[in-house]
Regions:
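Non-catalytic helical/linker scaffolds that mediate oligomerization, partner binding
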Residues: 1-465
């Protein structure tokens, strides 16, 4: 079974029911709805289609809502766009003006309070670079080019004082709660307080069971938010704008390692198979990029425009599956396990999960079976990246879907039993019925006793099917 999960962005190219069905059958694990684009009507139709088709195909495909985030953008130009020339002055203003070659309004009217003379300002994913020369954001153009309406503005190494949750994001998140999404991907996270604020909003409005994936997009976000997030998305597009491009691969590897060793999920995203937006095959460089993320141990790899707006969405999923499966065959899981740097003082769940993986490795077990209420034990087992398949039996569909993002985990739903051994037998039978196990397979089971208490993982059982 493939260990690395695949996140696919929905869009016009996936609005055909048969296309989306094929994407699920080929290996899509998570459907991403990008709320930087589209209407609520668009997103609801797509979410409803996912819910309908995942029942039909019998796959626990999760839904991820990706917020727009607290972005700064230029507003409108009189002619729709302008050409900025190297060396000229250009002003970003809080005043409402019709944009010209000399001046344009920005969406955040207090931006000038956060900037100082000498700071860099980047427009349109860094294609246009300017430097502040006066306090009212008069900039000298370093690299010129075309700027059109609503292009993004980035200020590297500056913690902007704008509110983290915008009015739009708040409404989008409340909509997501209504639609029973499984994950919120929080954009432009700079500090852990941003996530605590988001979690408070979820808890206040009945979304406490939604997992938060923090998108790391600048230098401030790398160090301080893993502990309060349920997962991390390495958003290499915006990261490449604010961090020197030669640093992106180094930071990507460090983030992946840090996050999965903390027992959390990590998604590697942006431009993974971008040429497949227009072409049926990837470049060799893209193939290597996907494979390197798999070698690094990423939980998931993500398709954006390739599936949302591309000509070959199903082929893009097939391609990712082929690359991931082939790369996983080459990974030395035993070596990776023994090189794992553990916490000095693990809790009981962590210690039991480590012992489970050790036992599975020693016995060359076909599978590790976790019986879980919250999904934590499955994620902790996953963090050790064992060679054995991880079959996780959850007692709710929500937890089952959320485990679809966890590396190496094949999630199933089973009804809760009060008797532990009856529950273990039910888990084995469910896995056998799905074809994940067969007679004679050796399994290592881990769970908590008493049954049904979240966070009580405390036992290991070796069982032959």
């Amino acid at each position: 079974m493939r260990k690395t999960k695949i996140v696919c962005t929905l869009g016009p190219s996936t609005d055909n029911e048969e296309v989306l069905r094929q994407m699920m059958l080929e290996g899509m694990n998570v459907a991403r709805c990008n709320f930087s684009h589209g209407t609520y009507e668009d997103h609801k139709k797509r979410m409803d289609m996912v819910k309908k088709l995942r029942k039909e195909v019998g796959r626990p495909v999760a839904i991820l809502l990706d917020t727009k985030g607290p972005e700064v953008r230029v507003k409108n130009f009189k002619e729709g766009k302008v050409i900025l020339e190297e060396g000229q002055l250009f002003t970003l203003t809080a005043d409402e003006v019709e944009g010209t070659k000399d001046k344009v309004s920005v969406t955040y009217n207090r931006l000038y309070e956060d900037l100082e003379v000498g700071m860099r300002v980047l427009i349109d994913d860094g294609l246009i670079e300017m430097k502040v020369e006066k306090n009212d954001i008069v900039c000298r153009v370093i690299n010129g080019g075309v700027v059109s309406n609503h292009k993004g503005v980035n200020v590297p190494d500056v913690d902007l004082s704008m509110p983290y949750i915008s009015d739009k994001d708040r409404e989008d998140i409340l909509f997501g709660i209504e639609q029973d999404v499984d994950f919120i991907a929080a954009s432009f996270v700079q500090k852990k307080e941003d996530i605590l604020q988001l979690r408070k909003l979820l808890e206040k409005n009945g979304g406490e069971d939604i997992k938060i994936i923090s998108k790391i997009e600048n230098a401030q976000g790398v160090a301080n938010i893993v502990e309060v997030s349920d997962g991390i998305m390495v958003a290499r597009g915006d990261m490449g704008v604010e961090i020197p491009y030669e640093e992106v691969p180094v930071i990507q590897k460090k983030i992946i390692k840090k996050v999965y060793r903390a027992g959390k999920q990590v998604i590697t995203a942006t431009q993974m198979l971008e040429s497949m937006i227009k072409n049926p095959r990837p470049t060799r460089a893209e193939t290597t990029d996907v494979a390197n993320a798999v070698y690094d141990g990423t939980s998931a790899i993500m398709l954006s425009g390739e599936t949302a707006a591309g000509s070959y969405p199903v082929e893009a999923v097939k391609t990712m599956v082929r690359i991931a499966e082939r790369t996983e065959q080459d990974v030395d899981y035993r070596k990776r396990f023994f090189l794992f740097e553990r916490e000095a003082n693990p809790d009981i769940t962590d210690a039991i999960c480590h012992a489970t993986c050790t036992t599975a490795l020693d016995l060359n077990a076909t599978a590790i079976v976790t019986v879980t209420k919250s999904g934590r034990s499955a994620r902790m087992v996953s963090s050790y990246r064992p060679k054995s398949d991880i079959i996780s039996c959850a007692t709710t569909e929500k937890v089952c879907r959320q485990l679809s993002l966890a590396w190496g985990v094949t999630p199933l739903v089973i009804k809760e039993e009060k008797d532990a051994y009856a529950l273990f037998d039910k888990a084995i039978m469910a896995a056998e019925k799905k074809g994940f196990l067969k007679k004679g397979d050796l399994t290592v089971i881990t769970s908590g006793v008493p049954i049904g208490c979240s966070g009580t993982t405390n036992m290991i059982k070796v069982q032959i099917v």
